[in-house]
Structure formats: structure tokens, C-alpha cells
């Protein structure tokens, strides 16, 4: 089973296509609509407004519960939940880190340029860097060195947090890795945007 977590734009054609690619490779792949209670991202043309009116109102706890439900559904519909993984892009990259700490059934995660640190609030009480010590599945972090929203220093901070967790015996933290593509911007996997970079996206 592979859970595919969208960017802030929701499950649009790009995310559907990524999910189909996993399905064609033989996985039961699911891309849940995680913003449905707050609104429809496809109705927004302005990112700042989308962020303010929908994304900021989505609690991490709600997302974790929805993903638990999606995984449970997969188990009842032919999926092997003993071999479950998660991958996500941008907003979904952050969720990938969180879910790899939340659910012990997850065996691996791949986080594409997901935020790892920042200000906390009631809906986002902890970021990945604060959860490194209790990570339950190894995560492969794929990040761009030219990402203006997630600086290389943030990647290095997360590496350090994972190293400290590994030194204290956390096997998932020890097995986690990063690949930093020096010239890649944010959203380098998004093949419908000008940020797309074929080499790191297909590496």
C-alpha cells in the first residue's frame, strides 16, 4: 500500500497521475482528499488566499486520523498493510514526516521538499524536527538546494536531529537519508509547473 499526499492544491491531475504510476507498478495506491472538510482547493487561483482560508485550518490531528482510516480501508480492500509506505509533495512532504512518526504500520516514507521546522500553532503543534526522536519508519528526504522556501540550513538541522535520535537508538532515524539536488528549486517533481526539473525528478 502506498499513500500519496498532495501539495496544497489537493488531489488534482498531477497527484492522480503519480498515484496511477504506483498502481501500474503493482501497488494499491491511495491519494486521499485531505482538505474536503475545509473547502475545495481547485476553486482558488491565489496561493496566499488558499493558504489562509483552507490549508491553515486543517489540523495535523485530523490528517493523521484520515490517513489511519485510509490505511484501514486499504487493508479491507486487498492491500497489504504490513507493507505500507507514504510519499508526499510540499505540504504532503511535511505530512509524510509526521505520519512516519505517527503510525508504526508505515514501513517507509519519501518526503519531497516538505517543510521540517517553523512556527507552531494549535493546528500544527509540532513539526518534523520536533518528532525526529520518535520516528517509527525511515524517511528519504528529497530536497532542492535552490529551494527558496526550505533553505539548506533547514535540511542540515533535520539531519542533526535525526543523528541525535540515531545516537539514542532510534533505528528509523538512523536509516533515514537525504538527497539534496544542488540546483533544484522547490516543486522540482511537479511536471506541470515551470519548477519541474527532469533529472532530479526521475533520479
Q: Where are the regions a protein language model picked out?
A:
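Hydrophobic residues in well-ordered beta-strands that form the structural core
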Residues: 30-31, 111, 141
